[in-house]
């Protein structure tokens, strides 16, 4: 029985002897001062030796300075593409094949609006392309609108779409928090002094 366990340990590798490598280093006596036999102490240098430590200087990005006009203390914040300069971009795509559709999704991820002109595509491929981009737009909380025959507008969630008749898609604003009124009633547990917590 013991033989089976030893074979199992050998197979798994638990019986192997661990070999440690030992290094013997000679002491570098040139860098040490002999404190006990110092008869003629050396004069202290006029200038202290520079530290070998590397200090990290605070860095600011050009985008932070441009957006706020001042240097920002939060240099590690990375903004959304196109959000710093406030310029909205619209990408017009006229794809010939379905393989060009990931470009539209990437543009939506970069907060760009996409006008998709599918007039030169095969109708079956065009339907597949619209379904693909519409699914990506939905996943990114965007909006889609049909502009004309085989022409579609896909926008990210930060773009408000409107027509002459009114707003089709409005950018949601964060709800305002209602202020909590101060309670004038004292707590019920504060009046009972003879009760003990269990």
Curated annotation (Swiss-Prot):
It comes from the Bacteria. GO terms for biological process: division septum assembly; FtsZ-dependent cytokinesis. Residues 170-198 are annotated as: Disordered. Keywords: Cell cycle, Cell division, Cytoplasm, Septation. Residues 179-188 have a biased composition (Low complexity). It is found in: Cytoplasm. GO terms for cellular component: cytoplasm. Signal peptide: none annotated. InterPro entries: Cell_div_SepF, Cell_div_SepF/SepF-rel, SepF-like_sf. Homodimer. Interacts with FtsZ. Belongs to the SepF family. Cell division protein that is part of the divisome complex and is recruited early to the Z-ring. Probably stimulates Z-ring formation, perhaps through the cross-linking of FtsZ protofilaments. Its function overlaps with FtsA. PANTHER family: CELL DIVISION PROTEIN SEPF. This is Cell division protein SepF. The lineage of its organism: Bacteria, Bacillati, Cyanobacteriota, Cyanophyceae, Nostocales. The gene is sepF.
